[in-house]
Amino acid sequence: MIQAGLRIDVDTFRGTRDGVPRLLDLLDEAGLKATFFFSVGPDNMGRHLWRLARPAFLWKMLRSRAASLYGWDILLAGTAWPGKPIGRELGPLMRRTQAAGHEVGLHAWDHHAWQTHAGVWSAQQLGEQIRRGSDCLADILGQPVRCSAAAGWRADGRVVEAKQPFGFRYNSDCRGRGAFRPRLADGSPGIPQVPVNLPTFDEVVGPGLPREAYNDFILERFAAGRDNVYTIHAEVEGLLLAPAFRELLRRAERRGIRFRPLGELLPDDPRSLPLAELVRGRLAGREGWLGVRQP
């Protein structure tokens, strides 16, 4: 049996409203549980369009055929009109996810703002964004938030420090191999991190890998004897690619791949996890910096 964590990022209003119910049905059909990370504040994701001026981001959008993949309502959200408040209007879907037995955590208050500004915000601004998101999601769920995942994997040592006071059991803020405890500025171990170590759809699909070949590509990358942490998006696998994701789940079962929530990948005693650094790095297929484990 190959153990794998399944992380579902929910970035937008439409992804929550339309993608999450579909994914809940698919996971129920497969008898699986996963971790859902919700964005709960305003949906301003359309404001990323200014990044088209950057060649790497423009190429990513063209390579993944973003307009057909996401839809124009997602690509324009929060541009000509105020972003819709996701948690306030769609909180019942977050409670439904929790009631179905899935792990639920915080992705962001404002996904666009975090992905754009996390690298330059002050410690106070970082903490305020985390607090707003955590308080909102806790009010929706009726219980404290126990885990989080930085939007766009935009995390570094400052983000690690900012999350320390919130009592999360773990965070999934970076890319890399194996769960670890990040080293804080004073040398002590921080809240455990569960990194993602498999590529996402939008990072690899393009001229060299057509959509139809993606399932073959990704399934070959799950391996026994290690943590496999895989991320999908409600805006992709919950919408246009839902049939392909359903087939991926079926094929994964035949290969002995068993998906579970990320929290179940942690040892009973987190003190057994190794210490490592969480630093800024680069990853093929992504525009800009992101958090990576080192070493």
Curated annotation (Swiss-Prot):
Spans traversing the lipid bilayer: none
Pathway where this protein functions: Glycolipid biosynthesis; 4-amino-4-deoxy-alpha-L-arabinose undecaprenyl phosphate biosynthesis; 4-amino-4-deoxy-alpha-L-arabinose undecaprenyl phosphate from UDP-4-deoxy-4-formamido-beta-L-arabinose and undecaprenyl phosphate: step 2/2; Bacterial outer membrane biogenesis; lipopolysaccharide biosynthesis
- One cellular-component annotation, GO: membrane
Q: Which organism is it from?
A: Pseudomonas paraeruginosa (strain DSM 24068 / PA7)
- Which Gene Ontology terms cover its molecular function? hydrolase activity, acting on carbon-nitrogen (but not peptide) bonds, in linear amides
- Superkingdom of the source? Bacteria
> Is Iron-sulfur one of the keywords?
no
Q: Which Gene3D superfamilies does UniProt cross-reference here? A: Glycoside hydrolase/deacetylase (3.20.20.370)
Q: Which UniProt keywords apply?
A: Antibiotic resistance, Hydrolase, Lipid A biosynthesis, Lipid biosynthesis, Lipid metabolism, Lipopolysaccharide biosynthesis
Which of the seven top EC classes does this enzyme belong to?
A: hydrolase
Catalytic activity as recorded in UniProt: 4-deoxy-4-formamido-alpha-L-arabinopyranosyl di-trans,octa-cis-undecaprenyl phosphate + H2O = 4-amino-4-deoxy-alpha-L-arabinopyranosyl di-trans,octa-cis-undecaprenyl phosphate + formate
Output this protein's name. Answer: Probable 4-deoxy-4-formamido-L-arabinose-phosphoundecaprenol deformylase ArnD
Disulfide connectivity for this sequence is none
The record's listing under InterPro entries reads: ArnD, Glyco_hydro/deAcase_b/a-brl, NODB_dom, Polysacc_deacetylase_ArnD
Q: What is its EC number?
A: 3.5.1.n3
Kindly state a single biological-process term from the GO annotations of this entry: 4-amino-4-deoxy-alpha-L-arabinopyranosyl undecaprenyl phosphate biosynthetic process
Q: What does this protein do?
A: Catalyzes the deformylation of 4-deoxy-4-formamido-L-arabinose-phosphoundecaprenol to 4-amino-4-deoxy-L-arabinose-phosphoundecaprenol. The modified arabinose is attached to lipid A and is required for resistance to polymyxin and cationic antimicrobial peptides.
What the record says about family reads: Belongs to the polysaccharide deacetylase family. ArnD deformylase subfamily.
Ranges where the NodB homology domain occurs: 2-260
